[in-house]
């Protein structure tokens, strides 16, 4: 009887040891899975911040300039009636703002899988807004002034983007001017010529610019729905 009892105890102890080992092993696997998911989430948030914030800022800067062109006589004041310095700034900075938006739109288009919007549906919505903006600039249903084909938009964006130590960034306005980038790139020359046409007759480009500004506002509302970065009163559609 003692031998049987001893055997039962040994068997029970063995089963407990196996069960404990199984629980430890499962716990370790669960922890590793959790750790991998958490690392993936943090990496996604990090990459999301790399793209979302610059895209948001670029969209705001461009829509603000378009609003000023259409509603505040920006080109009349600073290009048609301005000094040489003001004329230079009015054209070149506006071309830069378009190019800056193209850059971050291209970066997002390439790495859209890294933009953490919480669901694939929201990611698709961002893509739809981007396509609307791109189509607005390339469509021939408006006056041909400021018509920029999708391939040209992407090419300009590619030229503006930089990668330093694996980090994506966009050329700043100072670098844009000091590198004389605007003087030697045929697509920038094309965009500059189109902008000069707009400055001479804003009405010809008003439909395209209005549709563009509306699309950019939609992007702001999508990326910053709670008006944390930019208040609602600074997002008026023309």
Where are these regions (language model features)?
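Conserved non-transmembrane functional hotspots
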Residues: 19-238
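Short hydrophobic alpha-helical transmembrane segments
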Residues: 1-28
